[in-house]
């Protein structure tokens, strides 16, 4: 490892906030000055492609590909990501080594005149680029007009101000990290509007075998978050989760026990299947995998054939 630890990140305000939070935690844990770090901004395909849904453009990997290439090439030492944007299959030679303590995993509704989804007028436009959020909105309010909303948090809020839509759904964790929690007009309950696997958690990716970096990260890794994410990502992986599939999953850890709730839903919101499992937190990945097999058996293969 070089004297300066290079932190790779996307250039959006939220991505930079996450990179700087990681830097601050490392500085505090190891008594290091700011000069010991360099935040390296890397433009990704996901940032550049704004005219169509991610599912049509290539999926979640669009937000990580260029950053992971820089990590493999040694241009950066660690990569900081929103965990919900991470594909379940990482490139050879890379691993998710650490997670920061998870923020609030709930989604937030941001409305102008209407303060909740229930308050929206029939036929009102709600913006979202997430298939999961689109499907859940349609399940709650099939009379609404769900429109595609791409861009970072600030771009989406600007579109609301411009009247492109009457409301949108954003991750509450992202709003909090940007100091924008006040724009949330309603918080969506986890049981009604379950989050994406990994939502609210910052993940740190490294080269496999980079012992010096791994040793540094041990001090800031949050074990319960890592266990919850192992479960959620195993659930996603077993269902072939990508941006093409509306999948929700959320695990919580309490005194060494893990509780997981997962959901698969059709894009139009009319069909859904849920699963709930509990078990020892050390069996997190197994629980996630078992939950995926359970919900797949409940739904039947034809359910997936119809929309994946």
From Swiss-Prot:
Top-level taxon in the UniProt lineage: Bacteria
Q: Which major enzyme category is it?
A: transferase
| Modification sites for S-(dipyrrolylmethanemethyl)cysteine | 243
**Annotated metabolic or biological route of this protein:** Porphyrin-containing compound metabolism; protoporphyrin-IX biosynthesis; coproporphyrinogen-III from 5-aminolevulinate: step 2/4
What this protein needs as a cofactor is: dipyrromethane
Keyword terms of this UniProt record = Porphyrin biosynthesis, Transferase
Record bears the keyword Transferase: yes
Which reaction(s) does the protein catalyse, per the Swiss-Prot or TrEMBL entry? Answer: 4 porphobilinogen + H2O = hydroxymethylbilane + 4 NH4(+)
Q: Which cysteines are joined by disulfide bonds?
A: none
Q: Extract one GO molecular function annotation from the record.
A: hydroxymethylbilane synthase activity
User: SUPFAM superfamilies given for it?
Assistant: Periplasmic binding protein-like II (SSF53850), Porphobilinogen deaminase (hydroxymethylbilane synthase), C-terminal domain (SSF54782)
Q: How is the cofactor bound?
A: Binds 1 dipyrromethane group covalently.
Please verify whether the record's keywords include Electron transport. Answer: no
A Gene Ontology annotation in the biological process aspect, one of them, is: protoporphyrinogen IX biosynthetic process
* Gene3D superfamilies found in the cross-reference section: Periplasmic binding protein-like II (3.40.190.10), Porphobilinogen deaminase, C-terminal domain (3.30.160.40)
Q: What is its EC number?
A: 2.5.1.61
A GO CC annotation given for this chain = cytoplasm
- Sorted alphabetically, which Pfam families does this protein's record hold? Porphobil_deam (PF01379), Porphobil_deamC (PF03900)
Q: What does this protein do?
A: Tetrapolymerization of the monopyrrole PBG into the hydroxymethylbilane pre-uroporphyrinogen in several discrete steps.
Additional detail: The porphobilinogen subunits are added to the dipyrromethane group.
Subunit structure of this entry?
Monomer.
As for family, the record states: Belongs to the HMBS family.
Xref: HAMAP family: Porphobil_deam (MF_00260)
In Swiss-Prot or TrEMBL terms, this protein is called Porphobilinogen deaminase
Which species does the entry assign this protein to?
Mesorhizobium japonicum (strain LMG 29417 / CECT 9101 / MAFF 303099) (Mesorhizobium loti (strain MAFF 303099))
Q: Which gene encodes it?
A: hemC
């Amino acid at each position: 490892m070089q004297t300066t630890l290079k932190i790779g990140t996307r250039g959006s305000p939220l991505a930079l906030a996450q990179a700087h939070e990681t830097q601050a935690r490392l500085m505090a844990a190891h008594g290091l000055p700011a000069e010991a770090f360099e935040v390296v901004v890397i433009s990704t395909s996901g940032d550049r492609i704004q005219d169509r849904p991610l599912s049509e453009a290539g999926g979640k990997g669009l937000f990580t590909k260029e950053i992971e290439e820089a990590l493999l090439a040694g241009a950066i030492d660690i990569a900081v990501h929103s965990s919900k944007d991470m594909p379940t299959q990482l490139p050879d030679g890379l691993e998710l080594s650490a997670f920061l303590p998870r923020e609030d995993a709930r989604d937030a509704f941001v409305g102008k005149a209407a303060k909740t989804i229930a308050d929206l007028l029939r036929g009102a436009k709600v913006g979202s680029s997430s298939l999961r959020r689109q499907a859940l909105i349609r399940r709650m309010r099939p009379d609404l007009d769900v429109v595609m909303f791409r861009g970072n948090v600030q771009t989406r809020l600007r579109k609301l101000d411009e009247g492109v839509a009457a409301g949108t759904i954003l991750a509450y964790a992202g709003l909090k990290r940007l100091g924008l929690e006040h724009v949330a007009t309603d918080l969506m309950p986890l049981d009604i509007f379950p989050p994406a696997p990994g939502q609210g958690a910052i993940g740190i990716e490294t080269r496999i075998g980079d012992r010096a970096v791994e040793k540094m990260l041990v001090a800031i890794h949050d074990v319960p978050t890592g266990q919850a994410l192992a479960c959620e990502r195993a659930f996603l992986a077993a269902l072939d989760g990508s941006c093409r599939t509306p999948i929700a999953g959320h695990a919580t850890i309490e005194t060494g026990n893990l509780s997981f709730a997962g959901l698969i839903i059709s894009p139009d919101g009319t069909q859904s299947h849920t699963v709930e499992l509990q078990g020892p937190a050390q069996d997190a990945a197994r629980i996630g995998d078992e939950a995926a097999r359970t919900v797949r058996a409940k739904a039947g293969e034809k359910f997936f054939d119809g929309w994946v």
